[in-house]
């Protein structure tokens, strides 16, 4: 049965395949290059062996003819040449003058190669031999490979084998990747079902608690209960957004950000009053095409973060322009080395404040989805030893 992969599983599988296939590709490429060079060198060795055999054979015949001939060396040499007229060969005397040659470039080659040996020139292979020891006046012999050596067929074969083998590796790696992901997928599915069921079951009691807030009398103890319920409600909303977003079918609409922010501010007003915070907002009319729950999650988490980390009798300032949304509060210093970690889920810079460290993680996730940029700054304030902490979402990231 085929396994349908989720977004996170696809990401993990792509990462696994990227590393596995990348390393396999490099390894197979190195092996292919080594194989090509090995086969090429073997062919060149065979050519040299054939040329060495011919050189030894002709040298032995030259020496034998010299021994058998009494002074008539030229005729003996002509007889030898007639037997090897089809071979690519050149004969030279001790002064490097050409005695015979059917190799056009032999005169130039003998000038540049003084020592006997095997060499290549412009893609052709040659052997210079001095085994005749000047018998019959022949001091050196030059041989040329009669059949040009082409490696195109070898190259094609290696490329074909490489492609077929790499396709097999891709198939095996995809199969193994899915196989390894299956038990992880089962566990994630179990946890996911549990979270969604729990979130669904919490909906009714949370709604009842929120509705019952209106019936509580306005005294200090009841205000604390109200604040606790509001925080639970906020946490429930964040949890719902977190676990339900993969099945959410909400469409993109043109949002009135100012109206949404004012609505959220109303929901948090009692909590702001409870912490004795000065609240000020400077909002302009801004429209943004997005999902409503995404923006609500982004703003409500920024605002809740500002409330939690504000000092008593501090302030919260909200600023909305066409370029950015900024939430500022008066609180304690955020160390510069901690700023980059704040948007990591479950990370908090002040462990003395209640929370789970998921708020800015959700903010960052929404920012990435809409290609926005989250900037965090902590600057000294004029009010005592406190700092003004600024969380700014740039709409054009």
UniProtKB/Swiss-Prot annotation:
Can you tell me where the transmembrane regions are?
16-36, 157-177
Alphabetically sorted, this entry's keywords are:
Kinase, Membrane, Phosphoprotein, Transferase, Transmembrane, Transmembrane helix, Two-component regulatory system
Keyword 4Fe-4S belongs to the record: no
Could you tell me what reaction this enzyme catalyses? ATP + protein L-histidine = ADP + protein N-phospho-L-histidine
* E.C. number: 2.7.13.3
As for membrane topology, the entry says: Multi-pass membrane protein
What GO molecular function annotations does the UniProt record carry, in alphabetical order? phosphorelay sensor kinase activity
User: Can the keyword Transferase be found in this entry's annotation?
Assistant: yes
Pfam families, alphabetically? Answer: HATPase_c (PF02518), HisKA (PF00512)
Q: Which GO terms describe its biological process?
A: phosphorelay signal transduction system
User: Mind telling me which CDD domains this protein's record contains?
Assistant: HisKA
Major place of residence: membrane
Query: One Gene Ontology cellular component annotation?
Result: plasma membrane
Where the record annotates domain Histidine kinase, the positions are 197-395
* Purpose of the protein: Member of the two-component regulatory system CrdR/CrdS that induces the transcriptional induction of the copper resistance determinant CrdA in response to increasing concentrations of copper ions. Functions as a sensor protein kinase that phosphorylates CrdR. In turn, CrdR functions as a transcriptional regulator by direct binding to promoter regions of target genes including the crdA promoter or nitric oxide-responsive gene promoters.
Name assigned to this protein = Sensor histidine kinase CrdS
Q: Which source organism?
A: Helicobacter pylori (strain ATCC 700392 / 26695)
What gene name is listed for this protein? crdS
């Amino acid at each position: 049965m085929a396994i349908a992969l989720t977004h996170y599983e696809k990401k993990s599988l792509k990462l696994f395949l990227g590393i596995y296939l990348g390393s396999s590709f490099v390894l197979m490429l190195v092996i292919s290059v080594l194989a090509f060079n090995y086969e090429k060198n073997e062919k060149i060795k065979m050519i040299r062996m054939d040329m060495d055999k011919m050189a030894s054979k002709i040298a032995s015949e030259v020496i034998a003819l010299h021994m058998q001939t009494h002074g008539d060396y030229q005729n003996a040499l002509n007889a030898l040449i007639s037997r090897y007229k089809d071979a690519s060969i050149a004969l030279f005397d001790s002064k490097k003058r050409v005695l015979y040659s059917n190799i056009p470039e032999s005169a130039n080659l003998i000038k540049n190669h003084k020592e006997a040996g095997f060499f290549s020139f412009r893609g052709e292979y040659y052997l210079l031999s001095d085994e005749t020891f000047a018998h019959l006046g022949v001091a050196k012999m030059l041989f040329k490979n009669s059949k040009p050596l082409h490696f195109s067929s070898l190259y094609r074969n290696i490329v074909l084998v490489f492609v077929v083998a790499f396709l097999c590796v891709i198939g095996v790696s995809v199969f193994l990747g899915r196989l390894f992901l299956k038990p992880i997928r089962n566990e994630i599915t179990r946890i996911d079902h549990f979270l969604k069921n729990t979130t669904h079951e919490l909906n009714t009691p949370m709604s009842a608690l929120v509705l019952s807030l209106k019936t509580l009398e306005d005294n200090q103890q009841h205000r604390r209960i109200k604040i606790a319920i509001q925080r639970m409600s906020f946490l429930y909303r964040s949890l719902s957004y977190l676990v339900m977003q993969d099945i959410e079918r909400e469409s993109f609409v043109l949002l009135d950000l100012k109206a949404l922010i004012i609505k959220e501010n109303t929901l948090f007003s009692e909590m702001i009053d409870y912490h004795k915070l000065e609240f000020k907002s400077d909002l302009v009319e801004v429209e943004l095409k997005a999902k409503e729950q995404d923006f609500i999650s982004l703003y409500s988490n920024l605002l809740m973060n500002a409330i939690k980390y504000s000092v008593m009798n501090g302030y919260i300032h909200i600023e909305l322009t066409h370029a950015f949304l900024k939430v500022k509060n008066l609180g304690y210093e955020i160390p510069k080395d901690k700023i980059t970690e704040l948007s990591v889920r479950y990370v908090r810079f002040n462990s003395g404040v209640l929370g789970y460290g998921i708020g800015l993680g959700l903010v960052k996730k929404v920012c990435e989805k809409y290609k926005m940029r989250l900037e965090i700054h902590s600057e000294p304030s004029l009010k005592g030893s406190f700092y003004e902490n600024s969380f700014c979402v740039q709409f054009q990231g």
